[in-house]
Amino acid sequence: MKKLRLLLLISLIISCLFAFASCDDTEELSAPQNVEIEQATLTLNWKAVAGARLYTISIAKDGEEPREAIASKTYYSLTGLSEGHYTIKVKANGKEGVSRDSKWSQTVLFDREKETGMTFTLINGNTEYEVSSKGVASGDIVIPDMYRGLPVTSIGKKAFFNKSDVTSVTIGANVKSIGDYAFANCSYITSINLPKGLTTIGESAFASCRLMAGEIVIPEGVTTIPKNAFAYCGSLEAVVFGSNVTRIETSAFTDCAKLTALTLPDKLEYIGNLAFARCKKLTSLDLGTGVKEINDYAFSELVALESVAIPNSVERIGEGAFYLCELLGNVTLGNGIKEIANGAFYDTKLWNANTSSNEIYVGKWFLGCKDNTQPVLNLREDTIGIASYALYGNTGLSTLILPDSVQIIGEAAFGKMSIIVAIIGSGVTEIGSEAFGSCKQLSTLILGSFDDKNENIKYSSLKTIGDYAFRGCEVLDKVEMPSSLKVVGTYAFRDTGIYKNSENVVYADNWVVDYVEGIGANVAIKEGTVGIANYAFYNCTVLSSITLPNSVKTVGRAAFYDCSSLSQVELPATLEVIEDYTFYRCKSLNLFSLPPMLTYIGRSAFYKCGTSANATVGDTDNDVLFIPSDVKYIGDFAFYNCGYSERASIEEEQYYNIFGIDSIVIGGSVEYIGSNAFNGFISLKSVDLGGTQYIAEKAFYKCESLATVDFGTSLKSIGEKAFYKCESLKEVILPETLTDIGSYAFYKCESVANVELGGATAIGSFAFYGNTSLKMLDIPMSVTSIGKQAFRNCKSLTSIIVSPAIEVVEQHAFYGCSSLTIYVAYDKAPDTWHKYWNSSYRPVVYNCELSEDFSYVLYVEKGTISHLNSNSSLSDPVRAGYVFIGWGTSSTASVPAFTSANLSEAESGRKLYAIWAEE
């Protein structure tokens, strides 16, 4: 019996032990989350698991058994893996008696490429890769078309900078951009290709690739060859330019010593300083047909070049442009030249040729004399231009007589000469800056020539006298100006005898050219005066009023710049042009009428006028600024911040109203309103744009009181931020002529309740962002693109039609439009629309037909009425001038069968029509 009891007890104990063993109450750990691979460092990372002691990593290479590794941290380096495809997972290890191991995490896939020495970084919203070097790149570099399923589109700044062990580079077909210094100082690269899709080459991208030989082909998408792009590529033998290159910048091909021939594209307009300097084997140079400017030393030291044809398009040949082209003796000069700068052809065969003539010419331009001390000058009768510094410092001539054929006198052409008499001829139209500067003995100046009997003067057709043109001609006390003259430059007659008897104002014949110390506060310009020179009253802080007679036709650039006390100006009715900066920062200037014959208002012409404590509020009966009907151009910053007071104590409602302008009426001829032209007119309430065609960026920026704008019938383009934060603007009715609405054009115009887009084809990014009062909007069939966040936070907008013409809808276009239903003509969003075009998940009704009168036709099919947010309700469509009644089953229905609320109940395949009633 005792044995039986003992056996039962032992059996019970064993059973309990088994029971306890089978009832392990330790907790299983959670599986690791957020298992990811950091590509830049090839590190496996995951989120820490509470209670984990260690982590086990399972690494399985395709075709091989998995192996396991242990990690005590929440990361593990994968750099030791060989090339191949891997499946990787992680689990958390529990503590004995406390917790159990977790299940495996979700697997991640990993491709270990062959080591290339390159790093790939995601760009452009993680849709593309940019490549750079990790520091070990060497040998033959191959930049792939694709990486991890995405295109490689960019080579980063200094990506392979100074990699002397790189010998060749093959660039993938998808690369569009090569960054600054990307391959600079890769001195052993022997070859490189530029893919056809390339559009951008960075500064110094290939500079000092000294062994890069053969031919470089510039792709068609490239428009600019930037500074130093191929400088010091001493082995480069040929360059083939794409037809769309328009600019070659400074030193782009400097010291490409093996280039033998160049053919530049016809679209090329600009050649920068030193662009092809010291290309010492260049024997053939074709400049194309479009170049306008050859800058300083652009082709200097081309010691093998013998001839060149300058095309008719070239207007300026810069200083030293062909300096030290020792064999250059044959130059054909086009007929468009307006300036040949100092030493443009110095030390060429042209200059050093052994001829009997002392005068040196290129084409019909006089360059200078071999001997600058000769007392005789024999200019050819067909001479049309005098190059800059042509006779500068000549000590032999006492009388200078130019033939009537001469049209242009260059910069400092006759500076510091000992001439006493100068007769410039009747053909001259332009005298360059400092042309006769410091000719201290010059006493007689004839701006024309004598007739055959030497009795009467034939005045020249002179239009421009340049800055400082006669400065320092100490004994010159008289000059007769021709009636053709339009511009007299800054201080053109400063330090001449003309100043000796001047009181207050300095006159050169019938032009005001300067003022003298001691000028009075009130000045009346004498009758018969025809022009005011550039900078004539610059910084004349004592001047408070000036009266200009009706004979004045020209007021020069910056004529009254910084006349801070000037408050009263009477402009003549005959004035046609107000030049750039004319009344710049005349802080005390009060409102006045613009002359009726005005055609041009220059850049910053009235910049910050009327901003000082001395300015007075304009007459309330004269609160309209009329832009005369003949004005075609209003320059950038023309009226910028006029009336923005600096007085901290002024009442808030007057703070921006020193000019007293409530309205602007623009005449019918204006073609262009410049950027920031009326920026800061915060008291402005209404604008009539008349015949304006183009409104540039920020033209009416932050005109916070602007309530009404008549956009006219001619407007074609509205620039970026043109009406930015015009918070009082009520509606935007654009004409059919309009095509472009710039980014931020009507940003945060919070009072705009109605918008008609006219003939717009593109709606820029952020164009109507934050228009919280906007309720209705019909997008016309002309619109093809809607920019990023174009209608973001238009919280009152209830419906919008996206027509079949719209090819592109950018990211977050309708973000924050909390009341919006979107009607779309397609059966789904096209692939050309951004992935997050409807990032607010507003309800979308697909398969809508849109008629020309903005009626709706819906195809109700299964799945086409999409409530992407369960809290959203379908809003009624909106049509200007009508009230929506409901949805009918035929185009003639007058009684609705459905409302927007129960539209989803319509049977599949039914076609419904919007029913409208006139308001």
Residue ranges and their predicted role:
Residues 263, 357, 446-448, 665, ...:
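Secondary-structure capping and domain/repeat boundary segments
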Residues 67-73:
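Short beta-strand segments within Ig-like beta-sandwich modules, predominantly Fibronectin type-III
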Residues 124-126, 136-153, 164-177, 187-200, ...:
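Structural signature of tandem-repeat unit edges
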Residues 78-98:
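Beta-strand-rich modules
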Residues 48, 77-82, 904-905:
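Short, flexible loop/turn segments at beta-strand junctions in immunoglobulin-like
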Residues 157-159, 179-182, 202-205, 226-229, ...:
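Consensus positions within tandem repeat domains that build extended binding/scaffold surfaces
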Residues 42-51, 887:
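Conserved aromatic anchor
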Residues 95-112:
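Extracellular fibronectin type III
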